[in-house]
Amino acid sequence: MSHTVKIYD
């Protein structure tokens, strides 16, 4: 998986 910023609300 690519490195991405994951934000969980």
Swiss-Prot record:
Q: Name the gene for this chain.
A: psaC
Q: What class of enzyme is it?
A: oxidoreductase
Function, as annotated: Apoprotein for the two 4Fe-4S centers FA and FB of photosystem I (PSI); essential for photochemical activity. FB is the terminal electron acceptor of PSI, donating electrons to ferredoxin. The C-terminus interacts with PsaA/B/D and helps assemble the protein into the PSI complex. Required for binding of PsaD and PsaE to PSI. PSI is a plastocyanin/cytochrome c6-ferredoxin oxidoreductase, converting photonic excitation into a charge separation, which transfers an electron from the donor P700 chlorophyll pair to the spectroscopically characterized acceptors A0, A1, FX, FA and FB in turn.
Q: What is its EC number?
A: 1.97.1.12
Cofactor, how bound (note): Binds 2 [4Fe-4S] clusters. Cluster 2 is most probably the spectroscopically characterized electron acceptor FA and cluster 1 is most probably FB.
| Self-association and partners | The cyanobacterial PSI reaction center is composed of one copy each of PsaA,B,C,D,E,F,I,J,K,L,M and X, and forms trimeric complexes.
Record flagged with keyword 4Fe-4S: yes
Name its species: Anabaena sp. (strain L31)
**Entry membrane topology:** Peripheral membrane protein
Location within or outside the cell: Cellular thylakoid membrane
Gene Ontology BP annotations: photosynthesis
Which metal ions or organic cofactors does this protein require, according to UniProt? [4Fe-4S] cluster
Q: One GO MF term, please? A: metal ion binding
Major localisation: membrane
* Reaction catalysis annotation: reduced [plastocyanin] + hnu + oxidized [2Fe-2S]-[ferredoxin] = oxidized [plastocyanin] + reduced [2Fe-2S]-[ferredoxin]
Keyword entries, A-Z = 4Fe-4S, Electron transport, Iron, Iron-sulfur, Membrane, Metal-binding, Oxidoreductase, Photosynthesis, Photosystem I, Repeat, Thylakoid, Transport
Tell me which residues make up the 4Fe-4S ferredoxin-type domain: 2-9
Q: What is this protein called?
A: Photosystem I iron-sulfur center
GO CC terms: photosystem I; plasma membrane-derived thylakoid membrane
